[in-house]
Amino acid sequence: VMSSGKILCSTGALLLYGGDYRLLEPLSKQLRCDGFEFMMDCPYYQEMEALKRFLQESGLYIPVVHCEKSIGENISTGKEAQWADAYEKFEMNCDIAQSIGAKMIVVHLWDGLTSDSNFQNNIAGYPRLNQIAQRYGLDLLVENVVCSVENPMKHFCELNETYPNVHFVFDTKMAAFHGQIDLLYESEYEWLWRRKQIRHFHVNDYAGGYMDWGNLRSLPIGKGKIDFKRFFDFVKKIGYDDFFTVEATAHNGAGVVDVDMLNGQFAYIRASL
């Protein structure tokens, strides 16, 4: 039986982009998750000290921080000024993670319009990010972000060839977008879990077809096509004992949060473990 305390809710599921993070306190009292994965958004750079103070004083359990997404996009471009910006911002993300006692930091190593079209830049950008993360006592996790040119599993393999100690977060939706969810169960990729290189899972459903950009949103488990019974049977079988984060958008455009839907997700995951 897995130890408890492993089910997290992404704050990105709760707040509009750059939304009022103070809403997390009242929401946390209604949500039956074990903790949160804090999603860093661009507007928060303007109020880092206030954000840090709020998160520290709130007492929210936040073992994972998800980096703001422009970092990967800047690294993809390969331009010096944008690299400098990426590292500076990444350090701010690490600083906030360390100050609230987080242990892991998730990064989109490639992102945005550039995506993985210059993947040599993303490979080259990784070590500096990892050095910064280590300085802050954080485990850096590279996510299997959707790609416009190749596919995330190919990039995981390339990263692993260059940096055999690289760690990953595996997002079920991102994998399904590329038709790669079943690769997780194949012997060719068992190094990912045998060597404990997957340190974290994002559990989101996906309703689209292969590389179906119009259907990229993260759906609640059961609202898409992913076989989650097989997924949870597998993670139990391999003895995975770390975090799962629910990211399915739970707010409507007006910012009203569907607490019941999220609590249903947490209950489903708990019952599956």
Residue ranges and their predicted role:
Residues 12-14, 39-43, 67-70, 110-112, ...:
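Active-site beta-loop-alpha junctions enriched in small/polar residues
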Residues 50-59, 125-135, 188-192, 230-234:
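Catalytic-core regions built around general acid/base machinery
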Residues 1-92, 98, 134, 167, ...:
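N-terminal pre-domain/capping segments
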Residues 76-168:
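Active-site acidic/histidine proton-transfer and metal-coordination neighborhood
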Residues 34, 61, 103, 139, ...:
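Residue-level detector of anion-binding/catalytic polar loops
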Residues 2-8, 17-29, 101-103, 120, ...:
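Histidine-acidic metal/acid-base catalytic patches
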Residues 46-51, 116-119, 255:
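Metal-dependent catalytic neighborhoods of phosphoester/phosphodiester hydrolases
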Residues 15-16, 42-43, 85, 121, ...:
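Residues that cap or flank secondary-structure elements
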